[in-house]
A protein has these predicted regions:
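Short, well-ordered beta-strand micro-motif
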Residues: 28, 137, 163-165
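Active-site glycine-centered loops adjacent to acidic/histidine catalytic or metal-binding residues
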Residues: 10, 107, 128
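Short beta-strand-to-loop element that shapes/binds the nucleotide-sugar donor at the catalytic cleft/hinge
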Residues: 56, 123-140
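Catalytic-core segments of class I nucleotidyltransferases/pyrophosphorylases
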Residues: 101-102, 109, 115-118, 130, ...
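Conserved catalytic-core motifs of eukaryotic protein kinase domains, centered on the activation segment
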Residues: 17-20
């Protein structure tokens, strides 16, 4: 059974001032911390072990999960200095023996189907780009169509969930973001795939 890496080492600057006191994985959504939502989600798809990449307020996350009855095995990959998403995956990947694994960003709550995602190698889950603003279709200064707060058709965004082959680990930087290093290189070589999830919660 595959393992999953949760990228939870960031400081959560966009959630300040909350994250001045609580690490982003422990920020509650409907009174349940994000990290618990994620573990339940991964457990639903048969994941038996997660590796949580931490750096900021690691002890708070460890202590919280130790007090909970978590149904799957939890390990920690601790960054003494920020490594970026690529460096974090590479470091955590040393604990993975399987041929492939999942990666999920530490601030996501979703229902994207991991079984479907696992059908492809080196694949990024993508969802339709969403906006809270009305969309105008124009011809010079005339509005042809007005669409209120919805998905932008045929424009897809990275959902922050990946199914990767173990071989990618040796190509990742020791420090740096996977989105700025490996993914662009793989895309140019035709080695990076996506699976589109329409109408998924995210």
């Amino acid at each position: 059974m595959l393992k999953a890496i949760i990228l939870a080492g960031g400081r959560g600057k966009r959630l300040k001032p909350i994250t001045d006191y609580v690490p982003k994985p422990l920020v509650p959504i409907k009174n349940v911390p994000i990290i618990e939502w994620q573990i339940k989600y991964l457990e639903k798809y048969g994941i038996k072990e997660v590796i949580i990449c931490t750096g900021y307020k690691t002890e708070m996350i460890e202590n919280h999960l130790n007090m909970k009855n978590i149904g799957i095995k939890v390990k920690f990959s601790i960054e003494k200095t920020p490594l970026g998403t690529g460096g974090a995956i590479k470091k955590a990947g040393k604990m993975i023996n399987e041929k492939s694994f999942f990666v999920i960003n530490g601030d996501i709550i979703t229902n994207i189907d991991l079984n479907k995602l696992a059908e492809k190698k080196n694949v990024i889950a993508s969802i339709e780009l969403r906006t809270k603003y009305g969309i105008l279709e124009t011809n010079e200064d005339k509005i042809l169509n007005f669409r209120e707060k919805k998905e932008i058709s045929d424009t897809w965004m990275n959902a922050g969930i990946y199914h990767l082959q173990k071989e990618v680990l040796k190509e990742l930087p020791d420090k740096g973001d996977i989105e700025k290093t490996l993914f662009p290189e793989y895309a140019k070589k035709g080695k990076l795939n996506t699976m589109k999830f329409k109408n998924s919660k995210w």
